């Protein structure tokens, strides 16, 4: 067993180093969408009631689910409310919503809630639709039957967004018409469900980086800063790793329906990097205190995933170069990100679920607190099954239990495969420090800093009480762990 002297020395080192690492209460990790399934085409609205309202394309493209959250980084935690389901009977024509329910967006306009989305019938004639709810809380009350929202062309349309700019309501969307590729169309609206006349084409995929896989401009989103209005858009095929964001900019006082008013940035606003493939289809929102701008987008965790259910929602803070937004490279998943300003400092808790067994990391509460075996058990919501990720520097975390404040510790500083993981007070030693390693799904591998090997469900146990150990990396399901945020 670890000697008292070794423990005392480690504790002294810990006290000397205290305060150097950022506390878990001030950080979160991406992805932030629902932990157990995908969340492509995310959109988040920060409302005046202090809540965030989150929608995304559902896995089966068959419904719209709405989540309400008091925090931006915790938007994927709450249970979803289904507010729309595709029509049960297949149909054809340009007035159908029996399949391909894509890219919902929620807005609050003139005292009512609207969710816009695109859908189609059996002949893939995609159009934009809107549903309305007059209840104060959109997760309650009823939503109206969908109404089609189209300009006079009434052509193929997806990925709509609406915004009020200088007192005028606009809609932008992705259009295919006249034998042309996907382009961005923009129009004024006379009401939240009525477009005035014919939309103007304001962006066409002309750059090489907009043409990977296909010539595509889609998923426009507005953000206003100072004297400029910007419109981000997604470029290239979503089925490629090179799906990315571009940026259009115009003077706030310009005629926005004049294509000449818009200037396209020569380089992408956001593209693949740091293990994020095909980042795109974004939204913009504010921090809880309104002082920061944040971008919300989806990306894949591995190459070749395309427009599938591997896409997850990520967020990161925007900075500004004058009135021009700067996003930078995608933030790597599983790394500590400072929480949005005004979000609070309450500890963020996770359940850590094993991919192989479906059980969660727990502590043998019948054993003495110091040295108690860490094992897996069915999730009962107990405090020994809730863990915080506390950054300790260089990308590493300590895994702290809500049960008694102890941390996950590789017993006796072992570097050998098969060494047990136990519960001990934190002493700032490397056998108590772990880094999250991205896999090709939402699961992580968890590597110990001291030994360099992985957190492991011993022998792939399916049983309650299955021992948690460390083992050489084999990239199998007993070494894959899902961090499911619980608050």
Which residues make up each language-model segment?
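Generic, low-specificity signal for short hydrophobic/alpha-helical stretches with a mild N-terminal bias
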Residues: 5, 25-26, 229, 266, ...
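N-terminal signal peptide c-region/cleavage motif recognized by signal peptidases
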Residues: 17-21
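Non-catalytic nucleic-acid-binding interfaces of large nucleic-acid enzymes and RNP effectors
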Residues: 13
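Bacterial N-terminal signal peptides that target proteins for export
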Residues: 1-9
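Lectin-like carbohydrate-binding module/patch detector with strong preference for beta-trefoil
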Residues: 344-487
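Carbohydrate-active catalytic/glycan-binding domains of CAZyme proteins
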Residues: 24-346, 431-433
